[in-house]
Amino acid sequence: MAVITMKSLLEAGVHFGHQVKRLDPRMKRFIFSERNEIHILDLQKTLQGIKDSYELVQSVIKNGKKVLFVGTKKQASEIIEQEAKRSEMPYVNNRWLGGMLSNFNTIKKSVQKLKKLEKMEVDGTFEMISKKEVSQINREKLKLAKNLTGIKDMEELPGAIFIIDPKREQIVINEARKLGITIIAVVDTNCNPDVIDCPIPGNDDAIRSVALFTKIISDAILESDKEVGIQIVENLNEEDLMSEIEVKNERKES
């Protein structure tokens, strides 16, 4: 059973939002306070978002669907790949190709081409062609693999998408909404939570925060067949929480 504590969220810097001037007004309901011109997120609402997303993910998996992990920013890329592989789910961590969802049949053809090129590498084809041809094939294979490796085994549209930084991944959200695919996302203070089916208020820039959220989603998938839920331990009251919150240089503003 996954156990989440208020202290673990604080240690990961989950509560740190962006500078006050970067607030999306639609995020106001998730704001706890303000410190040194930095917004502090309400961790009670973060915990609720975690609980809701955990249950939603397990429901998707039990219905025989997959969860697509998406995070293309530098802080998220490696974590997204690692946790998606751990839970044997598809992922996109380099660049979202327009139409990955809305034009899925065309994308599948590109995936089939990638698989064909990979097969040529091991079935003896390379021994029968020139070095120049091998070089050309390898270049094409690497180009396709860069963006498609994570979805090679995604035979149909996912039941849900988990996104790190929905503000960055607007194309993903637009495609998913048009197709009615459930969207779960970590929403920072500069995001629009209204386009997300299951928003999780949190820091989407700090690596520890991104890792914590992504691991929770992966754990939910892995435990979906065990009828195991998530345990929330709220071991800090509001007074303790306020004393713990000290904004130093936890966030690099761009």
Swiss-Prot record:
Spans traversing the lipid bilayer: none
Point out the gene that encodes the protein.
rpsB
InterPro entries assigned: Ribosomal_uS2, Ribosomal_uS2_bac/mit/plastid, Ribosomal_uS2_CS, Ribosomal_uS2_flav_dom_sf
- Keyword check for Amino-acid biosynthesis, yes or no: no
Q: What Pfam families does the record point to?
A: Ribosomal_S2
Question: Which HAMAP family does the annotation name?
Answer: Ribosomal_uS2_B
Task: Please list the GO terms describing molecular function.
Answer: structural constituent of ribosome
Q: Which GO terms describe its biological process?
A: translation
The record's keywords, sorted A to Z, are:
Ribonucleoprotein, Ribosomal protein
What family name appears in the similarity comment? Belongs to the universal ribosomal protein uS2 family.
- Entry-linked Gene3D superfamilies: Glucose-6-phosphate isomerase like protein, domain 1, Helix hairpin bin
Q: Which GO terms describe its cellular component?
A: cytosolic small ribosomal subunit
Q: Which top-level group of life is the source organism from?
A: Bacteria
Q: What is this protein called?
A: Small ribosomal subunit protein uS2
